[in-house]
């Protein structure tokens, strides 16, 4: 299986530019440590769907050990966090976990992740700041 190499955001400036300059697609950023098991699993999933979602989403990786600028602002305390942005606006999604700011658990199904990204993108285009996930992850609640 050929996987797409996802672009790395190596500085805070690169993260800002990715969020600010994309005007048509959802910006998806996986924050975490590249050698963390959860990150590796999620990176594989994200790289496997990148080509399928390229028309409405762009996916980036950001190592929080290299870029610590956003740790406090986005509360990046989990080993792996996926966040969503559209038109320079942080998009929130209710996954049923109590934390609408970020996805901080592993989604292990490609179609589920595509559906989540598409739902957030459709909500963002309608100027909704918070959308409800098509799947309930209450059982994956992370403290």
UniProtKB/Swiss-Prot annotation:
Presence of the UniProt keyword Acetylation in the record: yes
Short name of one Pfam family: DIM1
Disulfide bonds: none
Any GO BP annotation: mRNA splicing, via spliceosome
A GO cellular component annotation in the UniProt record: nucleus
Subunit structure of this chain's protein: Component of the U4/U6-U5 tri-snRNP complex composed of the U4, U6 and U5 snRNAs and at least PRP3, PRP4, PRP6, PRP8, PRP18, PRP31, PRP38, SNU13, SNU23, SNU66, SNU114, SPP381, SMB1, SMD1, SMD2, SMD3, SMX2, SMX3, LSM2, LSM3, LSM4, LSM5, LSM6, LSM7, LSM8, BRR2 and DIB1.
Family in the record: Belongs to the DIM1 family.
Function: Essential role in pre-mRNA splicing. Also essential for entry into mitosis (G2/M progression) as well as for chromosome segregation during mitosis.
Protein name: Spliceosomal protein DIB1
Organism name: Saccharomyces cerevisiae (strain ATCC 204508 / S288c)
Name of the encoding gene: DIB1
């Amino acid at each position: 299986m050929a996987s797409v190499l996802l672009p790395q955001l190596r500085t805070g400036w690169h993260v800002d530019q990715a969020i600010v300059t994309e005007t048509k697609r959802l910006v998806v950023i996986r924050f975490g440590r590249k050698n963390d098991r959860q990150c590796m699993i999620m990176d594989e999933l994200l790289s496997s769907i990148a080509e399928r979602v390229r028309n409405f989403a762009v996916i980036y990786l950001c190592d929080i050990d290299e870029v610590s600028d956003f740790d406090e602002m986005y509360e990046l305390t989990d080993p792996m966090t996926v966040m969503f942005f559209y038109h320079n606006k942080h998009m929130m999604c209710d996954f049923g976990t109590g934390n609408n700011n970020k996805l901080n658990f592993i989604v292990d199904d490609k179609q589920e992740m595509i559906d989540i990204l598409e739902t957030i993108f459709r909500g963002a285009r309608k100027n909704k700041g918070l959308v409800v996930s098509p799947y309930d992850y209450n059982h994956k609640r992370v403290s």
